[in-house]
Amino acid sequence: MRQLGRVLTLFAALTALLLGAGLPAQAFPQAAFPLTSDGNRGSDVVALQHLLAAHGRPVTVDGVLGSGTRGAVVAFQQAKGLTADGIVGPATWDALAVTVRQGDSGPAVRAVQSLLNAKRSAGLAADGAFGSATQEAVRAFQSHAGIGADGVVGPATWKNLLWHYENIDFGTGTMCAQSPDGNAHAHWATAGAVAQLEAAAAAFAGTGNGPLPVGDAGFEHGGDIPGHASHETGLDIDVWPVRTDSAQCTAGRITWQSPTYDRAATRRLVQEIRAKAPGHVELVYFNDPQLISEGLTTSYPNHDNHLHIRYR
């Protein structure tokens, strides 16, 4: 009986080992190919443009999904027997994704390098040559994602890399980081949301009304964030209204009712937010009744002192 017990224990251990051998841990079970369409911008669009070139459909690599890129997407979808709607969803990404490894070169490698730089600050030369530095960066990302660090960029690595959130860049001087709820490292969002906000902030900076304070967005891999009922899926970002003295990054916080509230400048800010993400702004919560009447913002409780942008 004792011997039978030892045999059963050994069998259970071997079964667990065999089952685990082919199933690497999945750190991001929510990982999925992003839905990318007209008006989107950012590092995912850059990768898309490189991958189109890898399939013989070169377009200008500008990080914006405009008419030229959309036309190339439609042509690619038609050639692959996919729904030719110009929307890059899971089936189109899956068909575009090219497995690359050390020794390969070309636009698909450039797509990998650009994504690693944008989402993991890899510091790679986006030269299209899959050398040792790129291989090490790929392995580091794979370890980070829990998908098996073999250095080969296959379907699972593409999906996790394209899904992974991006940190807002505060180094340009057009924005300043704020953490009103004490959430450290909470300025991550989808690549599209980040790029669209950065473009809006850059355009707004040209008005001379000072940099844009950015409150919480989300954590690197999403999930619950203290002080927020949303901000879990990388599509929600808080920014602060503009002051008449343009000191919104250094002076005290205001509401739309404060004497130092600059309605005209805040209106312009919302207009830039919408203009830089055509068709991709779900809503902007902010309780200024004038901006609400103009169709620029939507009323919601506790949104007197910040604008809550929800991208789609």
Language model features: what each stretch is:
Residues 159-160, 187, 228, 233-235, ...:
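Catalytic cores and adjacent binding grooves of peptidoglycan-active enzymes
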Residues 28-34, 53-55, 93-98, 117-121, ...:
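Acidic/histidine-rich, surface-exposed loop or edge segments in extracytoplasmic proteins
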Residues 67-71, 75, 79-102, 134, ...:
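Extracellular LysM carbohydrate-binding repeats and other cell-envelope/extracellular binding modules
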Residues 39-46, 63-68, 86-90, 103-110, ...:
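Soluble non-cytosolic domains of exported or imported proteins
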Residues 196-228, 280-298:
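Extended, low-complexity, intrinsically disordered C-terminal regulatory tails
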Residues 2-10, 17-18, 23-63, 68-71, ...:
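Acidic, Ser/Thr/Pro/Gly-enriched interdomain connector segments
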Residues 163-214, 261, 265-274:
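Active-site acidic/histidine clusters and adjacent loop/turn architecture
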Residues 52-57, 77-84, 100, 116-121, ...:
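Sec/Tat-exported extracytoplasmic proteins
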